[in-house]
């Protein structure tokens, strides 16, 4: 009688342990799935928003520009160099390195300010324009003048052709109208001559000439 409760307790503990193990396994699998989904979402968001910035912009004499982008190797090298360079705490330096550190910082800041101001002054004075810009402008100006001259010549030729065609048309119209006027005048003259002859004949009939015996 005493062995049956002990066996029931052991069975209950075994069932509880198996249930806890199953719940733990299910929780781990669910956590892994959620982590994977979250990682995928984050990766897609980063890919969609990532924009590559050019490392430097090269300006040519002709006025054209070319953007140079860094490769993956350059980015890795830059990260390694940043990791290698140690951070300096000026408060922990002695007097010599402390003064040297601030002298270098002042020199670099002064050079950067001079570079910025020099670039602005050069752009205001027009020094930053390309070396042969005047030759390029002159070439485009001459090309524009040639195109305008060709356009004027073409328009004058078209106007002259149109004038010649109109002149030929008017001449042909005059030539077709002129024979009709000549024919009508000839008819008038003939009729006039016929009428004159009839009048002479009538007068001769009315006034007979007396013949001497």
Curated annotation (Swiss-Prot):
Signal peptide: none annotated. It comes from the Eukaryota. Residues 147-175 are annotated as: Disordered. The modification Phosphoserine is found at residue 70. The modification Phosphothreonine is found at residue 71. The modification N-acetylmethionine is found at residue 1. Residues 162-175 have a biased composition (Polar residues). Keywords: Acetylation, Coiled coil, Phosphoprotein. Residues 136-173 form a coiled coil. Belongs to the FAM177 family. PANTHER family: LP10445P, PROTEIN FAM177A1. This is Protein FAM177A1. It comes from Homo sapiens. The lineage of its organism: Eukaryota, Metazoa, Chordata, Craniata, Vertebrata. The gene is FAM177A1.
């Amino acid at each position: 009688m005493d062995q049956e409760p002990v066996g029931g307790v052991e069975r209950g503990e075994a069932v509880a342990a198996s249930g806890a193990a199953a719940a733990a396994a299910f929780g781990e699998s669910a956590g892994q799935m959620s982590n994977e989904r979250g990682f995928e979402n984050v990766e897609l968001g980063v890919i969609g928003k990532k924009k590559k910035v050019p490392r430097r912009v090269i300006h040519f004499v002709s006025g054209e520009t070319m953007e140079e982008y860094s490769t993956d190797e350059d980015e890795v090298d830059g990260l390694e160099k940043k990791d290698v360079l140690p951070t300096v705490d000026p408060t922990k330096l002695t007097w010599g390195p402390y003064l040297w550190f601030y002298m270098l910082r002042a020199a670099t800041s002064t050079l950067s300010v001079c570079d910025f101001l020099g670039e602005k002054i050069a752009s205001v004075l027009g020094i930053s324009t390309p070396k042969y810009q005047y030759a390029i402008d002159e070439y485009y100006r001459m090309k524009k003048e040639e195109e305008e001259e060709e356009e004027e010549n073409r328009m004058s030729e078209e106007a002259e052709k149109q004038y010649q065609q109109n002149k030929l048309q008017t001449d042909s119209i005059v030539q077709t109208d002129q024979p009709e006027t000549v024919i009508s005048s000839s008819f008038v003259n003939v009729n006039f001559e016929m009428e004159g002859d009839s009048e002479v004949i009538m007068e001769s009939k009315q006034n007979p000439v007396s013949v001497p015996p």
